[in-house]
């Protein structure tokens, strides 16, 4: 079997939609409770976090809406549920902080990325406030102006 190429940053999957839909205020690193077939699929990069979010139940954090596609070569004696809820591993202080923030009106907890940290798979979660439509337009406008500015600086150096 050919050696798999590693991601340069160790990133497995990102939730770009979350950065567009929320003002990210604080980030946390959480471990994940996974089964064997899920780890194999994540090594192959078969994960999506597009509509994923974090819920707190009974003092524990759970990741909902993430999709890990099972490999075709995975074991057949284990029933693979690609969209099952996965437990997040946070310490007590982090759980209390997330719980207090989510209890406030307007705050939510979303998953931003899945990545490798040494030999472990971690999930970057964040506390954020939802953006309104005009906030999203402002963000796009600001990004476009920054891009134009960078392009002008780059072209100025070529003209000299």
Swiss-Prot record:
Chief place of localization: cytoplasm
GO molecular function: RNA binding
InterPro entries noted in UniProt: SmpB, SsrA-bd_prot, SsrA-bd_prot_CS
Localization per Swiss-Prot or TrEMBL: Cytoplasm
PROSITE patterns linked to this entry: SSRP
UniProt key word Hydrolase: no
Keywords annotated in UniProt: Cytoplasm, RNA-binding
A Pfam family annotated for this UniProt entry: SmpB
GO cellular component: cytosol
Role description: Required for rescue of stalled ribosomes mediated by trans-translation. Binds to transfer-messenger RNA (tmRNA), required for stable association of tmRNA with ribosomes. tmRNA and SmpB together mimic tRNA shape, replacing the anticodon stem-loop with SmpB. tmRNA is encoded by the ssrA gene; the 2 termini fold to resemble tRNA(Ala) and it encodes a 'tag peptide', a short internal open reading frame. During trans-translation Ala-aminoacylated tmRNA acts like a tRNA, entering the A-site of stalled ribosomes, displacing the stalled mRNA.
Similarity remark: Belongs to the SmpB family.
Protein name: SsrA-binding protein
Source organism of the structure: Pseudomonas putida (strain W619)
Lineage, top ranks: Bacteria, Pseudomonadati, Pseudomonadota, Gammaproteobacteria, Pseudomonadales
């Amino acid at each position: 079997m050919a050696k798999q190429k590693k991601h340069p940053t160790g990133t497995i999957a990102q939730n770009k939609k979350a950065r567009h839909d929320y003002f990210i205020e604080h980030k946390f690193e959480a471990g994940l409770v996974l089964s064997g077939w899920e780890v194999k699929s994540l090594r192959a990069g078969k994960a999506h976090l597009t509509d994923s979010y974090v819920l707190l139940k009974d003092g524990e954090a759970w990741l909902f809406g993430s999709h890990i596609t099972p490999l075709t070569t995975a074991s057949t004696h284990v029933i693979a549920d690609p969209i099952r809820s996965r437990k997040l591993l946070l310490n007590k202080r982090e759980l209390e902080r997330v719980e207090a923030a989510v209890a406030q009106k307007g705050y939510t907890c979303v998953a931003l990325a899945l990545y490798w940290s040494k030999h472990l798979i971690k999930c970057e979660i964040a506390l954020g406030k939802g953006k309104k439509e005009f906030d999203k337009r402002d963000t796009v406008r600001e990004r476009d102006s920054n891009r134009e500015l960078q392009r002008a600086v780059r072209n100025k150096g070529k003209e000299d």
